[in-house]
């Protein structure tokens, strides 16, 4: 369940602050304070996942909302280096498909590790359109960040505050199909069993953190 949301640099919203979701919500504010922008941000994502895109966001859809493009959607007072960002805090995440979290060698990942945390991403624009420049994921024991300065840059990985160096180039693939987040692609072409890929190193590092702190809730084996 999503507990709260924070929006930065979308139209008239420079920084919404943390907005907690309630069963009944009343938005109060002066004209052009961001009330309609906040409400329209939800169908913005609906129209973006309803179609195949060459990027993360569909800024315009005749059936939903029209934000124009990245340039017109960005807050005019935002710094040039800043992007449009969305941050969500979640709890009681019970819809995890456990089959997707297979851990090699019989290691265990504790259910509490994945059950609550926060997630955020930042959008930026260039001559080709809109792209995701930053993704951050925080769980009980893991802080995981991925970022690029340009859509074609190597991904910068930071795990619990420590930069991670991949042995090969890993970059975002923005050709999403009915989704918003990019996939991670590699320029690695060798299939040798002796090669250690960046995927494996990241995977092993994250799993090592997740299984290192036993919790009272007991382990879940994937």
Roles of regions detected by a PLM:
Residues 1-222:
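P-loop NTPase switch/coupling surface
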């Amino acid at each position: 369940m999503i507990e709260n949301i924070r929006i930065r640099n979308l139209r008239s919203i420079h920084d919404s602050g943390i907005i907690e979701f309630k069963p009944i919500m009343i938005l109060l504010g002066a004209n052009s304070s961001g009330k309609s922008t906040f409400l329209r941000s939800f169908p913005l994502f609906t129209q973006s996942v309803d179609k195949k895109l060459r990027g993360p966001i569909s800024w315009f859809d005749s059936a939903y909302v029209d934000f124009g493009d990245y340039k017109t959607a960005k807050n005019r007072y935002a710094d040039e280096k800043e992007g449009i960002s969305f941050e969500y805090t979640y709890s009681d995440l019970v819809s995890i498909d456990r089959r997707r979290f297979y851990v090699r060698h019989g290691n265990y990942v504790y259910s509490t590790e994945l059950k609550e945390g926060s997630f955020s991403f930042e959008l930026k624009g260039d001559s080709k359109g809109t792209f995701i420049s930053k993704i951050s994921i925080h769980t009980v024991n893991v802080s995981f960040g991925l970022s690029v300065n340009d859509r074609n840059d190597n991904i910068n990985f930071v795990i619990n505050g420590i930069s991670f160096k991949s042995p090969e180039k890993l970059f975002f693939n923005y050709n999403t199909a009915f989704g918003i987040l990019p996939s991670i692609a590699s320029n690695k072409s060798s299939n040798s069993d002796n090669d250690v890929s960046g995927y494996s190193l990241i995977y092993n590092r994250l799993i090592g953190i997740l299984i290192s702190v036993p919790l009272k809730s007991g382990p879940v084996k994937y």
